[in-house]
Amino acid sequence: MDGSTAAIILTLIVTYIIWFVSLRRSYKGPRVWPLVGSLPALITNAHRMHDFIADNLRMCGGTYQTCIFPIPFLAKKQGHVTVTCDPKNLEHILKTRFDNYPKGPSWQSVFHDLLGDGIFNSDGDTWRFQRKTAALEFTTRTLRQAMARWVDRAIKNRLVPILESARSRAEPIDLQDVLLRLTFDNICGLTFGKDPRTLSPEFPENGFAVAFDGATEATLQRFIMPEFIWKIRKWLRLGLEDDMSRSISHVDNYLSEIINTRKLELLGQQQDESRHDDLLSRFMKKKESYSDKYLKYVALNFILAGRDTSSVAMSWFFWLVSLNPRVEEKIINEICTILIKTRDTNVSKWTDEPLTFDEIDQLVYLKAALSETLRLYPSVPEDSKFVVANDVLPDGTFVPSGSNVTYSIYSVGRMKFIWGEDCLEFKPERWLEESRDEKCNQYKFVAFNAGPRICLGKDLAYLQMKSITASILLRHRLTVAPGHRVEQKMSLTLFMKFGLKMDVHKRDLTLPVEKVVNEMRKK
């Protein structure tokens, strides 16, 4: 190497160091290293990523910025990440400047093979059209009635017998797996009117469910590697990308068969419009003519949204309730109070039929406990947006175009400046305080998203969760199996890494009923 070459290399190194030192001064949060940025900290804390993000946000006052590619021309674009949990910033991103913060090209590229241009993977006019169409369906009472039928049937014919069997055998049961199967069957029934029956005593494997899980897992794997790498793996059909191709093919064939069958059924069913009230049939009955491809993406988008989120939330709910007997007692008392009014004091008849709409609606404390669960353990703990144009967040943070903003839903519920000194306590009562101004505080609780993209199925989710949790708690007392570890799985959805093994005990309602009756007499 001659002297001039060495001088050029040395000059480049010195120039980079000066540039990097200047760059690093602008960041707070995890340490940024030359060339590799904050990746070492992210890798070291991968097993506790959500708490790691929350720790950094706590130290930085609710917002920090970091760099994962400290390379000139990339550092302030693709390599630049803004992380926030400040409700003012969330309102700005999710509502005020909604059009400036779409899903973005990277997100859409990752999910396109599975979700296409469906409602959860699209932006702009494509999203607006689908949102408007879907919103009309989610506001109908008949869809709620359809959900209630699927849920009630599953509770009575499958969930109750399976839990009773586990109790009689004195064997722990993986409640997370049970709830995943239950909600998968329910959302498939509601979406395209077919029950895959994954929740059965034998816990069978279902081809569609296995293929859907495989495609979802492969999609999530794409998030942990650079885009060009997974695209090369896809082109070469390597590893999970090859599995994903087969899984999506299976899912595609399964849904094609359902769509073709439904078309024939709808043609021969002109007089009886009520026979098919699932979402797929509702879209097919509209005046607009939708392609089979579009209908498949409609189905897959709603299955992905409705399956894992509710089951994961209920898993964390039962774990939290098992650790907080005071909360469990208040839930039981509330259920007993309502059933005494609607079904008298004959407890043996309380479990003959699932709870009705009116009974479910009166479970205010149970809903508060579910909301409190979602505050601490949101089903989707982190979400991100792409920045279209340079912007300044309400807290003064500058965000450059081409960069990404991550809003930590998990962290929002764990900040003292948002929820007070007791923010880490499981306290359903905070949702019942009369002084709580829900309109002002809606960006303090974004488990169902917020702004124009707020979850259309929020009310259906609460209906399903309240029905299932009330039915279980009315019949059984659940405790975590001895030696079982409850740990978060690092994924886009907040699964429990080792499931939720629980012992099932018979619920004795004698004392709760006596207590409620005595209190009612005093009034």
From Swiss-Prot:
Keywords: Heme, Iron, Membrane, Metal-binding, Monooxygenase, Oxidoreductase, Transmembrane, Transmembrane helix. Its cofactor is heme. GO terms for molecular function: alkane 1-monooxygenase activity; heme binding; iron ion binding; oxidoreductase activity, acting on paired donors, with incorporation or reduction of molecular oxygen, reduced flavin or flavoprotein as one donor, and incorporation of one atom of oxygen. The keyword Membrane applies. Pfam families: p450 (PF00067). Expressed in stems, flowers and siliques. Belongs to the cytochrome P450 family. This is Cytochrome P450 86A7. The gene is CYP86A7.
